[in-house]
């Protein structure tokens, strides 16, 4: 399905979200450094964990609100609110005021607004795109996000430290403009029947709404197929989240200075730090260039085996890293790692939309994100594991988690196929 054939709302979002994501990634990668300098590493770490907890809660509420009030209303409200949060962030770093405490509050609010935005954005795609094309569309949005992730920090490395107030003010303006763009140039995609169903519900007041939400998420987690999907995702996250955890630490300790190319009498050498930068660029370049191509290729195969072999390749990439200290082997391992990532990036989002009833799509997407949020909380344990077991065993254990996730996916599809046959 070509972009020109998309619903107008998705075209508007694709452009607007690219600029929003690019500006966001000019700020986000440098916040850990900023808060560590202002509060100290220990307190900064605790504050970032607290911020993450608020974002998880907001994400779950975002799913409920997207199903209850509609996709468009949530997207507009979250984008504008995020703009005001960044405006507060800018004020806390302005010529008139310098307040790290207010900066943390503003950052937390901005993160919560982003978490409110995400479930509605995913559900909107599932609302308007036929099932057979959803993987392609999710892949295109993923590609633009990763281009933003590559471009944003390049500018942010200069702007965040030298022109922080101006940068944060710009991000605030872009967020509000995105909200206005969504307000006037997108349409509501949640069906009128579903909205009417919510209006006829029995929940009254905020207590009733909260009880209804808890009940709905309870129903979702009783879905054994979906629960296995989340469990497999948490296991797999222990591998792919090592890109900015154990992998850079290993490279730094393994490569002192190594010649990677000798051409016409000139040598090119890398250190552990520069080698990680090259591998990160490799990952970003492959994602930017090949996400849509690989996603379309993978749709030709059964989802069960795509999920399974993606998990095996993640495990293989982890096994390759400790085998050597040669940079080019690391380069190959990163290619395997990235290919495994791209095999499932569109298919998994499409699979969630197939599991979710139309009236609960937002909540399903929100609950599915638990595989990342819980995985992100557990993944840093890999760092002390290197002290307990050494790098070799740490990589083997991480790779084993990935392989185990593959077998969980097989069990999940066994139950899914049984359910599908029973519903025929």
Curated annotation (Swiss-Prot):
GO terms for cellular component: plasma membrane. The chain crosses the membrane at residues 15-35, 42-62, 74-94, 105-125, 141-161, 165-185, 227-247, 274-294, 305-325, 327-347, 367-389, 393-415. Keywords: Antibiotic resistance, Antiport, Cell membrane, Ion transport, Membrane, Potassium, Potassium transport, Sodium, Sodium transport, Transmembrane, Transmembrane helix, Transport. Norfloxacin transport is inhibited by CCCP. Optimum pH is 9.0 for Na(+)/H(+) and Li(+)/H(+) antiport activities. Optimum pH is 8.5 for K(+)/H(+) antiport activity. Its main location: membrane. Exhibits dual functions as a Na(+)(Li(+)/K(+))/H(+) antiporter and a multidrug efflux pump. Catalyzes the efflux of Na(+), Li(+) and K(+) in exchange for external protons. Shows a preference for Na(+), followed by K(+) and Li(+). Can also function as a multidrug efflux pump. Transports ethidium bromide and norfloxacin. PANTHER family: INTEGRAL MEMBRANE TRANSPORT PROTEIN, RESISTANCE PROTEIN MDTM, PUTATIVE-RELATED-RELATED. This is Na(+), Li(+), K(+)/H(+) antiporter.
